[in-house]
Amino acid sequence: MHRLQVVLGHLAGRSESSSALQAAPCSAGFPQASASDVVVVHGRRTPIGRAGRGGFKDTTPDELLSAVLTAVLQDVKLKPECLGDISVGNVLQPGAGAAMARIAQFLSGIPETVPLSAVNRQCSSGLQAVANIAGGIRNGSYDIGMACGVESMTLSERGNPGNISSRLLENEKARDCLIPMGITSENVAERFGISRQKQDAFALASQQKAASAQSKGCFRAEIVPVTTTVLDDKGDRKTITVSQDEGVRPSTTMEGLAKLKPAFKDGGSTTAGNSSQVSDGAAAVLLARRSKAEELGLPILGVLRSYAVVGVPPDIMGIGPAYAIPAALQKAGLTVNDIDIFEINEAFASQALYCVEKLGIPAEKVNPLGGAIALGHPLGCTGARQVVTLLNELKRRGRRAYGVVSMCIGTGMGAAAVFEYPGN
């Protein structure tokens, strides 16, 4: 109860907490490299497919996961048996996809001697996999491991919470855990005054940024083209290669967005156009202790500086990043001003806007290549995908810099991680 009162107290007065974040003194440059640093060696992702009608609609999640596992290992010429552990984030498969992920491991030529676990922390599952592998490296269990995320929203059942006690009816917070995500978006919009026009403008910007990035080839280095098969309308099977994200709509306009009806509530402001897309995809991130990476001659794409996950009220779960980001920044000894790029998952424009405004983040630092509204949101994949996108964009820019990955989490949480790009 005390925790809830603290969070609600933060929500009541945004200007004070926002200014406090901005007024904090800047960090004293970059930390010195340490042999014990947890570093990101490499990362790849599949294109993100449109669930139900895209190029991956007939592709099983183990095949998507195998594509990125294989690509990462081949890219850096790492022997599969060198992996100390694999962690795979997944939301919709039974048991967080534990069997599916182990199958993908074998399809990728990774031997049975390499262990694997599956993790489900809803929309942060891919980032939680990164944190889990980093934790194993830090505690000395192993020196190198693979963190992944995968989701086929086409082939998975959604909306079934499973076996739950009827006692939840007696507890408001327990009941709130079952509120549909679209209604939590409406709650955020209503409670904090996020207008339909602002949400649509945010969605338009996401589409425009993603379209520009796609046309310039900004995603080319991170995407693994996937050759697969699809069934056409006649039931015939044909082979295709999916090489770019399918949800990007360069023709999006404010006028078009304004015509869309509310998707979750009569008179509401959350629409299909200002919400994340239902998607299929996978991503993999190779992490190591710095000393092991150097010993094996592996590249260093980034350094994990901190990770934080926090709880917030379930009925406004989308505010999670507004509290997870400050927690992660504090652990890293940084402020909002020290960060070059914030990759904040766009579950809904309402909640993403709230978080950006709450923290006083300049718009140009937020999702510079577009976010989930344009690219899509394959639930278990997203956190790992964001890490890959963030570090590749920092690499493209070339200079030493910090970036943040963050997302809201269904049932009322937020997660965030701070990464350092070491510079070219």
Curated annotation (Swiss-Prot):
Acetylation keyword on record: yes
Cellular component GO terms, alphabetical: peroxisome
Active site: residue positions: C123 (acyl-thioester intermediate), C408 (proton donor/acceptor)
Residues holding CoA: R249, T252, S276
GO biological process, one term: fatty acid beta-oxidation
EC number: 2.3.1.155, 2.3.1.16, 2.3.1.9
InterPro entries reported in the protein's UniProt record: Thiolase, Thiolase-like, Thiolase-like_sf_Thiolase, Thiolase_acyl_enz_int_AS, Thiolase_AS, Thiolase_C, Thiolase_CS, Thiolase_N
SUPFAM superfamilies reported in the protein's UniProt record: Thiolase-like (SSF53901)
UniProt KW Ribosomal protein keyword: no
Entry text on domains: The PTS2-type peroxisomal targeting signal, which mediates interaction with PEX7 and localization to peroxisomes, is cleaved following import into peroxisomes.
Known partners and oligomeric status: Homodimer. Interacts (via PTS2-type peroxisomal targeting signal region) with PEX7; leading to its translocation into peroxisomes.
Function: Responsible for the thiolytic cleavage of straight chain 3-keto fatty acyl-CoAs (3-oxoacyl-CoAs). Plays an important role in fatty acid peroxisomal beta-oxidation. Catalyzes the cleavage of short, medium, long, and very long straight chain 3-oxoacyl-CoAs. Medium chain straight 3-oxoacyl-CoAs are preferred substrates.
Further information: There exist at least 2 rat liver peroxisomal 3-ketoacyl-CoA thiolases.
Membership in a protein family: Belongs to the thiolase-like superfamily. Thiolase family.
Name of the featured protein: 3-ketoacyl-CoA thiolase B, peroxisomal
Gene coding for it: Acaa1b
